[in-house]
Amino acid sequence: MMIRERIEEKLRAAFQPVFLEVVDESYRHNVPAGSESHFKVVLVSDRFTGERFLNRHRMIYSTLAEELSTTVHALALHTYTIKEWEGLQDTVFASPPCRGAGSIA
């Protein structure tokens, strides 16, 4: 199973999202092809109601602790309640460009 699929599976089980998108953005960074190390996650769930963004991120980090301790280097997290998501009208901001130094030969 690919890392992206494992991330999706764990997040679906933990948060029962109404919307979930996991995008492998590793190609945008200074890593070898096929690294599966940088991901963007858009997660919409009522589990976030009443939670600050920092705690929402901690909830995800806890869920993905194994992946973060091994293969996943970075997560760009976009976490919303259903009400917040409706207010955004399905608009999600793009991840910033890589600021890593050097290049992979």
From Swiss-Prot:
Pfam family, one: BolA
GO CC field: cytosol; iron-sulfur cluster assembly complex
Database matches in Gene3D superfamilies: BolA-like
UniProtKB keywords: Activator, DNA-binding, Repressor, Stress response, Transcription, Transcription regulation
Top-level taxon in the UniProt lineage: Bacteria
PANTHER family cross-referenced by the UniProt entry: BOLA TRANSCRIPTION REGULATOR, BOLA-LIKE PROTEIN 1
Leftover remarks: Was predicted, by combining genome sequences, physical interactions and 3D structures analyses, to be a reductase that interacts with a glutaredoxin.
Function: Transcriptional regulator that plays an important role in general stress response. Has many effects on cell morphology, cell growth and cell division. Acts by regulating the transcription of many genes, including dacA (PBP-5), dacC (PBP-6), ampC and mreB. Probably involved in the coordination of genes that adapt the cell physiology in order to enhance cell adaptation and survival under stress conditions. Essential for normal cell morphology in stationary phase and under conditions of starvation.
Protein name, UniProt field: DNA-binding transcriptional regulator BolA
Organism field: Escherichia coli (strain K12)
